[in-house]
C-alpha cells in the first residue's frame, strides 16, 4: 500500500506509509502537517481524528523529526553551494613592496624638484621672495601662504641634511681645492641620496651608482679605521688615535702586537713547536689536593702522543718491530706527563722480526688480537707461495689431491680425469 501511495500521490512524504486511500492519505497528511507545524494557530480538526488506524502522537513526532532533518540538510547544502571559491588572484609582493618603499621614501625625502636648465638652479630659492614682493598679502591669501612657508623650511632642512650626507659620503664628484661647499650640496642633493631618482640630481650629472656607495669611497672619519687600544679601551694607549693595522706592522709596536696573539705566531716550523712547554694540567689548581700520584691516575687523562711529521705513530708499517729512534723524555717539573712523552708501542712486536721484511713481523704483531685464527707458517721472503691466494690450494684442501698431483673432484670439472 505504501508503494502504491508513493506512485499515485504527489506529496513527498507519502512513502512513509500512512493507512487509507491515496486521496484520503494526501488530505490527511496535509492536515497533519498543518497540525504539527502550526500548533499555536491550529483552528481546524486535530490530525488524529482524520487518520484512520494510526496513532496521532507517533505520526506527529515522526513528521516533526523528518521536517527538521530536511530543513537542516537543505540549509547545509545551500551554505555549501553559496560558499565562495578560493581566490585565484596572484599578488606580486615584490612590486607591492617596491611601490610602498617608493611612496614612503617620497614622503620622507620631500624636496623641491630639480630645475629644467642648469641656469635656473637658484629659482626655488628666489621663488618665495618674489611671491612676497609682487603679490600683496591679504588675509585669505596669508592662510594659503603658510603651507608654502612650511614647504620652504622643509626644503631648507633637507638641503642641510644633504650637505651633511655629502660631506660624509662624497663619491659622486671629487671637488677641487678651490671649489666652495655649495657645489658639493648641488652635486649630492637629498633626494638623490634618499630616492636615487633622476629628478633629484640637481646641478650635476646623473650617476648610475649613486644609490650604493662602496665603503672605500666614503669619507669616513679616521676613528672608523682606528684600532682599539689595549689600555682600558681609551684612545690614549700605545696604539694612538690614528694608528691602523698597516702602521702596527712597523717599528717596535709590531712585536708587542704579535705578543698578544700568543704562541700561534711562534718561530718554530714543526708541529711540536706550537705546543706549550709547560705540561697541561687537566684539573684546576684548587683541586690539586684531591689528586693522587701520577702512576695511579686512570688512563683517561693521558695526553695524546706527539705528532711526528704527518704520522701519529713513528714506526713505519714495513718495520713494526724495528727499533725506532726516540728522543729522551723531558722531565716534567711537577712529575706529571708531558706532551713530548716518547711513544709507547701500541701493538706488541716480535723481538726477532727482521727490519726490512713486510709480512711476518706485521702478522706477528697482530696475533694477540686474532687469537682464534690460526695462521699458516710464513714462507721465506724470496719464495712466492700460493697458499694465501683466493683460490683452492693444496694446503687448505689436501684431501682433494692425490699423491701424484691429480685433482679428485667431481667428474667434468677442470683438472679431473675424464671417464
Swiss-Prot record:
<comment type="similarity">
    <text>Belongs to the FAM181 family.</text>
</comment>
<protein>
    <recommendedName>
        <fullName>Protein FAM181B</fullName>
    </recommendedName>
</protein>
<feature type="region of interest" description="Disordered">
    <location>
        <begin position="107"/>
        <end position="157"/>
    </location>
</feature>
<dbReference type="Pfam" id="PF15238">
    <property type="entry name" value="TEADIR3"/>
</dbReference>
<dbReference type="InterPro" id="IPR029359">
    <property type="entry name" value="FAM181"/>
</dbReference>
<dbReference type="InterPro" id="IPR053819">
    <property type="entry name" value="TEADIR3_omega_loop"/>
</dbReference>
Amino acid at each position: 500500500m505504501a508503494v502504491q501511495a508513493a506512485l499515485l500521490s504527489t506529496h513527498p512524504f507519502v512513502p512513509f506509509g500512512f493507512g487509507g486511500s491515496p486521496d484520503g492519505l494526501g488530505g490527511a497528511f496535509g492536515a497533519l502537517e498543518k497540525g504539527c507545524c502550526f500548533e499555536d494557530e491550529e483552528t481546524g480538526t486535530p490530525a488524529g481524528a482524520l487518520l484512520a488506524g494510526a496513532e496521532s502522537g507517533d505520526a506527529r513526532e515522526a513528521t516533526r523529526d523528518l521536517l527538521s532533518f530536511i530543513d537542516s540538510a537543505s540549509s547545509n547544502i545551500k551554505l555549501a553551494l553559496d560558499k565562495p571559491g578560493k581566490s585565484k588572484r596572484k599578488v606580486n609582493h615584490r612590486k607591492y613592496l617596491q611601490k610602498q618603499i617608493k611612496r614612503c621614501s617620497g614622503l620622507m625625502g620631500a624636496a623641491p624638484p630639480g630645475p629644467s636648465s642648469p641656469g635656473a638652479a637658484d629659482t626655488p630659492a628666489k621663488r618665495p621672495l618674489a611671491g612676497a614682493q609682487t603679490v600683496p598679502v591679504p588675509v585669505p591669501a596669508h592662510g594659503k601662504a603658510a603651507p608654502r612657508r612650511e614647504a620652504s623650511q622643509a626644503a631648507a632642512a633637507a638641503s642641510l641634511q644633504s650637505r651633511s650626507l655629502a660631506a660624509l659620503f662624497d663619491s659622486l664628484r671629487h671637488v677641487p681645492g678651490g671649489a666652495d661647499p655649495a657645489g658639493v650640496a648641488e652635486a649630492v642633493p637629498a633626494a638623490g641620496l634618499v630616492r636615487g631618482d633622476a629628478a633629484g640630481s640637481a646641478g650635476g650629472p646623473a650617476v648610475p651608482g649613486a644609490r650604493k656607495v662602496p665603503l672605500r669611497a666614503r669619507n669616513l672619519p679616521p676613528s672608523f679605521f682606528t684600532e682599539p687600544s689595549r689600555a682600558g679601551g681609551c684612545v690614549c694607549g700605545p696604539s694612538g688615535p690614528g694608528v691602523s693595522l698597516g702602521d702596527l706592522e712597523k717599528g717596535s709596536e709590531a712585536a708587542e702586537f704579535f705578543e698578544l696573539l700568543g704562541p700561534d705566531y711562534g718561530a718554530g716550523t714543526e708541529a711540536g713547536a706550537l705546543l706549550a712547554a709547560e705540561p697541561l694540567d687537566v684539573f684546576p689548581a684548587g683541586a690539586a689536593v684531591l689528586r693522587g700520584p701520577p702512576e695511579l691516575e686512570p688512563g683517561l687523562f693521558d695526553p695524546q702522543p706527539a705528532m711526528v711529521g704527518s704520522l701519529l705513530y713513528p714506526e713505519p708499517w714495513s718495520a713494526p718491530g724495528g727499533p725506532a729512534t726516540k728522543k729522551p723524555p723531558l722531565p716534567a717539573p711537577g712529575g706529571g706527563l708531558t706532551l713530548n712523552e716518547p711513544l709507547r708501542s701500541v701493538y706488541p712486536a716480535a723481538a726477532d722480526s727482521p727490519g726490512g721484511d713486510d709480512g711476518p713481523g706485521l702478522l706477528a704483531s697482530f696475533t694477540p688480537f686474532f687469537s682464534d685464527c690460526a695462521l699458516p707458517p710464513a714462507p721465506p721472503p724470496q719464495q712466492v707461495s700460493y697458499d694465501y691466494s683466493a683460490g683452492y690450494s693444496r694446503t687448505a684442501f689436501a684431501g682433494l689431491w692425490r699423491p701424484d698431483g691429480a685433482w679428485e673432484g667431481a667428474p667434468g670439472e677442470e683438472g679431473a680425469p675424464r671417464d
